[in-house]
């Protein structure tokens, strides 16, 4: 501030000195009096401003950046790092392409990471389970026909004798032999075999499928023997036994 005040006083002194000098010349030269006092003052002010601008520029260059006696450092903010750039941020970018991995592998890995982060899955993932998941659930492996029929290996594990070749519609000959020692019925159990009937009935099966009893069985049941006419009429000997007077001659 003191330097600025001294500079202003110096300029005023120069201006006043020039003004008085021009006034004296005006008195000596009356022919130039037509310009007037205002023209002289204007010229003096112009010269003073030019001198002050030159002096200010010289002081600035001499003072190392000082303008009107003031240092530029006083205009700076208290923070000395106000023009410093912000610290570098950590940029999370994709990995640099490596020659060991192909672009297809990078795309596949990126898709897997994206699905894991967003929780999205492909449509096929929800429609069908993978082969590896089915193998984990079933030790024997998944069914190739999508669990519609059990596989041959699984049926062998469940049934030691093996699966039925006709999908369990009929039992196999080997399984029937195990269940029935005498063997299965060749007509699918519609009729019992002759050997099985002999075992059940010591006298043997009825050759007419039990529709009529045999002569030997009737003899065993009735000591007198069976009726030769299939029991439709009693015999003469039976009637004699039933009625002491003998049978009726009209009936027989």
UniProtKB/Swiss-Prot annotation:
CLE- repeats: which residues?
136-147, 157-168, 178-189, 199-210, 220-231, 241-252
- What is the top-level taxon of the source organism? Eukaryota
Where do the segments described as 6 X approximate repeat CLE lie?
A: 136-252
Asked if Glycoprotein is a keyword of the record, the answer is: yes
Task: Report residue spans for region: 6 X approximate repeat A.
Answer: 127-219
Q: Which keywords appear in this protein's UniProt record, sorted alphabetically?
A: Apoplast, Differentiation, Glycoprotein, Host cytoplasm, Repeat, Secreted, Signal
Identify the main location. Answer: secreted
In the record for this protein, the A- repeats are positioned at 127-135, 148-156, 169-177, 190-198, 211-219, 232-240
Q: Glycosylation annotated at which residues?
A: 32
Q: Where does the record place the region Disordered? A: 116-252
Q: Bias regions of kind Basic and acidic residues — which residues? A: 125-137, 144-242
Q: Does the keyword Phosphoprotein apply?
A: no
The cross-references to PANTHER family, in alphabetical order and at most eight, read: PROTEIN CLAVATA 3
Protein purpose: Mimics host plant CLE extracellular signal peptides that regulate cell fate. May play a role in the differentiation or division of feeding cells (syncytia) induced in plant roots during infection.
Per the similarity annotation, which family is this?
Answer: Belongs to the CLV3/ESR signal peptide family.
Entry protein name: CLAVATA3/ESR (CLE)-related protein 4A-1
Q: State the organism of origin.
A: Globodera rostochiensis (Golden nematode worm)
Name of the gene encoding the protein in the UniProt record: CLE-4A-1
């Amino acid at each position: 501030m003191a330097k600025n005040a001294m500079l202003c006083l110096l300029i005023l002194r120069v201006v006043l000195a020039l003004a008085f000098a021009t006034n004296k010349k005006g008195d000596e030269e009356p022919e130039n009096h037509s310009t007037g006092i205002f023209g002289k003052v204007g010229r003096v002010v112009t010269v003073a401003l030019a001198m002050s601008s030159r002096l200010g520029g010289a002081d600035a260059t001499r003072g190392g950046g000082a303008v009107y006696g003031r240092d530029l450092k006083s205009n700076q903010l208290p923070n000395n790092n106000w023009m410093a750039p912000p610290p570098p941020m950590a940029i999370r970018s994709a990995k640099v392409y490596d020659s060991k991995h192909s672009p297809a592998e990078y795309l596949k890995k990126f898709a897997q990471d994206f699905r894991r982060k967003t929780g999205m899955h492909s449509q096929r993932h929800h429609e069908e389970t993978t082969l590896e998941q089915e193998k984990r659930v079933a030790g024997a492996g998944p069914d190739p026909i999508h669990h519609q029929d059990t596989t041959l290996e699984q049926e062998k594990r469940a049934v030691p004798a093996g699966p039925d070749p006709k999908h369990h519609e009929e039992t196999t000959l080997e399984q029937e032999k195990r269940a029935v020692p005498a063997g299965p019925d060749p007509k699918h159990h519609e009729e019992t075999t002759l050997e099985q009937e002999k075992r059940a009935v010591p006298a043997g099966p009825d050759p007419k499928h039990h529709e009529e009893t045999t002569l030997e069985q009737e003899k065993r049941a009735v000591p007198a023997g069976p009726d030769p006419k299939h029991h439709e009429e009693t015999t003469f000997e039976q009637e004699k036994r039933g009625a002491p007077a003998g049978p009726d001659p009209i009936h027989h």
